[in-house]
């Protein structure tokens, strides 16, 4: 078992594809599709790595990440951010919010897998 | 030689797909089941009549069995693999496309779709930041594209995928593509409604070109004694933007002056005698050759059945007027071929150049060009004149000794002449054979 990934994303078929890829590579994948209580879900699950979409219903991925980074228990959690906007402004915002890595949609499956592996040192 | 050795696999694939038993196919093709088994496992070569018989029983073209999927499909699959960066077995792409033609085609279609969508998404990213409705639609499209892209990549990967998952992914792609179609349709409707005005017909120069082309470069309103630019403006400039109306009015005013100086009934007789030769006509009419060139471009078909082409550029080389000929196309945007006599005329203002020209890839006698640069506007005191060049292109006249035509092109991007000192950018065409 490579570890637990928590995927917070609201697009069901993206969830399905990422879940398939990561599960096949040996990861235990949990998913969540709502921004409002996302931070609580992260705390409850305490995953090894978090994949976080920026545009979530209810609450933005940036806000969720800022809240987590303020919590000492999650200050070092590896976070891969997904966004549908590639502008440097978004990358900057993600970095400032504390993302470990930033990925633009549409992404290559292999890149997601590589990023997850690299961020967890697996 | 995968192409050669896979015929058996394709026979088996096809047979299983249409639910024919091996023994039945063997019997109907007049061979033993064990021999067919060897063929299907690519251990015996097959060709000739037996191949035709088996193809007939399986109801496919024999080439589908021998050659498998088309070269275009294979090429697309290769590109897909290289773009998506997976670990696809490129050496077995033939086999994949041959054995799963439906899946292979689906994959190719998905890629085509992804490419198109990615392109439109790229084009629109700029607007994304400014328009909330656009931002929402584009986010939706990107999400859907991402889902399709990921799912298609999984299907494209080598190795077994559980059939249940395969079905599920197939269904997801189907759903997402339907959603994508819906979103893009909505987006197009929105954008069309949004861009109803200024951006519709491109630059003012393009609007002018379109308006003049629509009237055949001939304006009857200006050919009569009391002809008025206003009447012509009303007909031609109705739908034009304000800037284009300005350009059009300038052009029509010049047309009116040319028509007053060289009315049709005056031009008719020397034209019958000399043809559209601007030098001879300028002599016969005692007129400015530049004006004669412009006038020739405006003549109606009953006076000049074979039309002439005309290009006018300003001192920067920018085309300000273009009337192309079928044998002498002119670029709609950007710079024209630097070899055009039009530009050489700017090197030697006041000298009338007259020479045959030939576009690449065209045979026959070619065309004849006259080019002349003259000052535009009034002569300024102690200041440089602003030159303008004109080039008339006309059918090759009958001359006793034809010089070698000067090779010219349309524009570098669409020109096959590789060894050209004037080339400014690479050609998108393959080099001329």
Regions found by a protein language model. Give the residues of each.
Chain A
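Short hydrophobic/Thr-rich beta-strand motif most characteristic of the beta2 strand and flanking loop
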Residues: 26-33, 41
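The feature encodes the CheY-like receiver
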Residues: 15, 57, 75, 87
């Amino acid at each position: 078992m490579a570890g637990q990934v928590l995927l917070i994303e609201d697009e069901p078929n993206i969830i399905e594809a990422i879940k398939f890829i990561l599960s096949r590579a040996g990861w235990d994948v949990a998913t969540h599709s709502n921004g409002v209580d996302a931070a609580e879900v992260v705390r409850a699950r305490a995953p090894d790595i978090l994949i976080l979409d920026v545009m979530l219903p209810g609450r933005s991925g940036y806000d969720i990440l800022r809240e987590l980074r303020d919590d000492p228990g999650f200050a070092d959690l590896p976070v891969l951010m997904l966004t549908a906007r590639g502008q440097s402004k978004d990358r900057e915002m993600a970095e400032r919010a504390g993302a470990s890595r930033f990925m633009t949609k549409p992404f290559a499956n292999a890149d997601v897998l590589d990023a997850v592996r690299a961020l967890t040192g697996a | 030689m995968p192409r050669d050795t896979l015929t058996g696999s394709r026979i088996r694939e096809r047979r299983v797909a249409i639910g024919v038993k091996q023994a039945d196919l063997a019997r109907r093709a007049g061979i033993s089941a064990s021999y067919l088994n060897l063929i299907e496992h690519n251990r015996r070569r097959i060709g000739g009549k037996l191949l035709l018989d088996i193809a007939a029983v399986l109801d496919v073209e024999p080439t589908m069995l021998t050659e498998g999927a088309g070269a275009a499909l294979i090429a697309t699959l290769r590109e897909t693999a290289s773009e998506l960066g997976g670990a696809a077995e490129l050496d077995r792409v033939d086999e994949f496309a041959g054995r799963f033609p439906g899946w292979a085609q689906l994959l190719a279609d998905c890629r085509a779709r992804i490419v198109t969508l990615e392109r439109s998404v790229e084009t629109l990213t700029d607007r994304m930041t400014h328009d909330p409705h656009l931002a929402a639609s584009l986010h939706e499209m990107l999400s859907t594209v991402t889902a399709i892209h990921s799912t298609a990549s999984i299907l494209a990967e080598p190795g077994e995928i559980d059939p249940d998952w395969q079905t599920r992914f197939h269904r997801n792609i189907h759903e997402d593509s339907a959603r994508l179609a819906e979103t893009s349709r909505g987006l197009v409707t929105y954008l069309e409604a949004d861009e109803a005005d200024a951006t519709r017909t491109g630059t003012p120069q393009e609007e002018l070109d379109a308006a003049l082309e629509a009237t055949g470069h001939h304006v009857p309103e200006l050919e009569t004694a009391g002809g008025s630019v206003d009447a012509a403006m009303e007909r031609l400039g109705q739908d034009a933007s304000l800037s284009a109306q300005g350009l059009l009015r300038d052009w029509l005013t010049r047309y009116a002056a040319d028509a007053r100086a060289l009315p049709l009934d005056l031009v008719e007789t020397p034209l019958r005698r000399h043809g559209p030769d601007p030098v001879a006509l300028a002599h016969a009419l005692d007129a400015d050759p530049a004006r004669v060139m412009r006038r020739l471009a405006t003549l109606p078909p009953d006076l000049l059945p074979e039309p002439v082409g005309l290009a006018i550029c300003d001192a920067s080389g920018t085309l300000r007027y273009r009337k192309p000929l079928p044998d002498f196309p002119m670029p709609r945007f950007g710079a024209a071929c630097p070899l055009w006599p039009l530009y050489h005329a700017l090197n030697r203002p006041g000298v009338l150049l007259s020479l045959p020209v030939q576009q690449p890839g065209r045979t026959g006698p070619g065309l004849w060009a006259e080019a002349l640069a003259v000052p535009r506007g009034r002569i300024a005191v102690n200041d440089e004149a602003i030159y303008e060049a004109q080039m008339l292109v006309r059918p090759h006249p009958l001359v006793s000794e034809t010089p070698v035509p000067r090779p010219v092109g349309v524009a570098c991007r669409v020109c096959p002449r590789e060894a050209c000192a004037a080339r400014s950018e690479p050609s998108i065409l393959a080099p001329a054979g």
